[in-house]
Amino acid sequence: MKLTLSWLKDHLDTDEPLEKLADKLTMIGLEVEGIEDKAKVLAPFTIAKVLTAAKHPNADKLQVCTVDVGDGAAPVQVVCGAPNARAGLVTVFAPPGTYIPAKDFTLGIGNIRGVESRGMLCSAAELQISEDHDGIIELPADAPVGAAYAAWAGLGDPVLDINLTPNRQDCAGVHGIARDLAAADMGKFKDPGIKPIKGEFPCPVSVTVEDSTLCPGFALRLVKGVKNGPSPEWLQKRLTAIGLRPINALVDITNYLTFDRSRPLHVFDAAKVKGNLVVRRAKDGETLLALDGRTYTLDSSVCVIADDHGVESLAGIMGGELSGCSAETTDVLIESALWNEINIAQSGRKLGINTDARYRFERGVDPAFMLPGLELATKLVMEFCGGTPSDVVVVGNPFADDKIIDFPLAEVKRLAGIEVSLTEIRRILNHLGFTVVGQAPVVKVAVPSWRSDVHGKADIVEEIVRIVGVDKVPLTPFERGDAPRKPVLTQIQNRTRRAKRALAARGLTEAVTWSFISKPFAEAFGGGQPELALANPIASDLSDMRPSLLPGLIAAAQANADRGSPDLALFEVGQVFKGDRPQDQFMAASGVRRGVASSAGLGRHWSGSAQATALDAKADAFAVLAAAGAPMAGLQIATNKLPAWLHPGRSGAIQIGPQNVLGYFGELHPRVLEQLGADGPLVAFEVILEKIPDPKQRPTRAKPALELSAFHPVSRDFAFIVDRKVAVADIVRAAQGVDKKLITSVSVFDVYEGKGIDPDKKSVAIAVTLQPRDKTMTDQEIEAVAAKIVAEVTKKTGGSLRG
């Protein structure tokens, strides 16, 4: 939001210096991002007169001018290429050493085609005061030669640039900013009433609103017999100062009121409107040639203003070229309306149009100012262009319901920690437009129509505190009682942190990918349901919520491979989505390894290089589970009911019991890699952290006592012949279950298939460690345990001890 100091003073009677006003604006929540003072930037530029202009001896399009720069100085020679440079012309001169804003360089003494030039005659574009660059500036003949140009031209009006927060739509106009400053004791607020202008005849154009939810209020007035020409110089200067281009009086009035009162309006050339106006939804396929020169194709989600001919305006966003006002306009229709904020935002985003009107309507304008805004526009049209006004046509209810809030005065102390008297509270709120009725301890506060952002007691406290001064709020540390502190992190947050550390420790690099993926990718990983499709995706290939982290990691791995880094290991811990309910959202830990990126390390090595395998992915998954507190002894590997994205013969599921699947690991299916446009092979894993069962005992900071046995451990090896389909894990669990206190370790050290073994059999060798606690074991006791192990494995697997 830009405004000039003189513009602000039209609404605020103040003598405060600019710097103090800017500081106060920032302190009350209207952050001043910058101040542009053209008088300082253009200080070196002076008014000069061209005495002679002769053709350059070595260039057809250049002239050698002698210039009177005033102050009794000798004439200066300047080489100029402007077509309008001529003797007797009064213009703007820049001496050597002057910084030229538009060209971003400092002028020096030049030599142009063999002729010395000791300065520059300037165009308006070079001074960045307009877009005119066709010739040098032409000033009146009586302009004082030698005087500072900026001071003479009235450019000493600083421009403030305010960064508005989305909730302060009332300050999208200079009037609202002045109101806030007046409440902060920076001056007296000027708020003259707006008198209705009596119509001289009935308006011949009627208005129909088909959907009042899109347009709660609409007002229209015809002004006949106008003479549309340039707007007054003061208005043109204000619009130019804030970056707008003056067009003609009718259009400039609407732009002025947009920034002055945050009241966007639109003007139609009445001669170009056919029949009556209808506010409706656009028909699919309808088009509009808009004022920006572009043709837009519309659909039924866009609200438009149409006549008998078709669409004439994008409601609340931009008017149409065919009904726009020009110098030939003699009858003008002035429109002032209220529009649905959400529809304006969605339509503007869909069409890719950003306008000052859209900016204000999508944040909400003052509904009570719809009719006064029309009256003020009518007054300015008649003042600048003449004409005779009609009666006003009003459709809908432009008035918002009164909002009354019961406000306990103690809320200021409770929420902000400062004491503010009722007298001061009344003063502040009254200056801001609120009405306060009643006495302590609870008063009733009526919210003004332009403050749609104020909904409750906390909002009123905010208004009081920002005017009193946020710097008045004391620094109050939180009280810390004697009770022990509760954990800051939830269990899932702890698991997330530990999983990240475990994977980083294994050499994987963390990646952060989009939560959105394309529909085909989502379907390949079990997603793609209609409820997971985005209503308004930011890109066509980011249309669905991800059911897995792996599509993003696979794409990242392939992108690195395409750029010369084929060997890498990536992981991510983030949300995945199985449905649209909160309970369908899970925290997953996933990773991929590609190329020579096994657990042993990345890239080639003197000792040999090995491609990453499913066992590397399994080790990564187990590292996550161990870090997250899973009961590792109870984990099982299953090879049935695997997801379609895994290779059926080189993958597995990690589960506890037959139902609770914690995750998957293995090599990705070649068909899925082809669908994702990735080169294989790739190995991957995914663990759902919420599926890990809670520990039976509450975690404690106290470490368990270290128990070391004084007796030697005993190790025994066993080899069993079992069917090939028997899982090795079944043998390990059977052996461990014989005596969980005595047996401290069971590990597999050999699996053999081949000569001497039946084709449908295999030999599995395990090492069992016994750790006595009370005494040294005798041979008989060892043999008894060994016999139990053989019997239990035989019973559970159907195998036999290998001879």
Swiss-Prot record:
EC number: 6.1.1.20
Gene Ontology biological process terms in this record: phenylalanyl-tRNA aminoacylation
Family under the similarity heading: Belongs to the phenylalanyl-tRNA synthetase beta subunit family. Type 1 subfamily.
Reaction equations catalysed: tRNA(Phe) + L-phenylalanine + ATP = L-phenylalanyl-tRNA(Phe) + AMP + diphosphate + H(+)
Ranges for domain FDX-ACB: 709-802
CDD domains on file: PheRS_beta_core, tRNA_bind_bactPheRS
NCBIfam families in the cross-refs: pheT_bact, YtpR
Source organism (scientific name): Rhodopseudomonas palustris (strain ATCC BAA-98 / CGA009)
Binding site for Mg(2+): 453, 459, 462-463
PROSITE patterns linked: B5, FDX_ACB, TRBD
Protein location: Cytoplasm
tRNA-binding domain segment(s): 39-150
HAMAP family linked: Phe_tRNA_synth_beta1
Protein name as catalogued: Phenylalanine--tRNA ligase beta subunit
Disulfide bridge map: none
Obligatory cofactor(s): Mg(2+)
UniProt keyword terms in alphabetical order: Aminoacyl-tRNA synthetase, ATP-binding, Cytoplasm, Ligase, Magnesium, Metal-binding, Nucleotide-binding, Protein biosynthesis, RNA-binding, tRNA-binding
Residues annotated as domain B5: 400-475
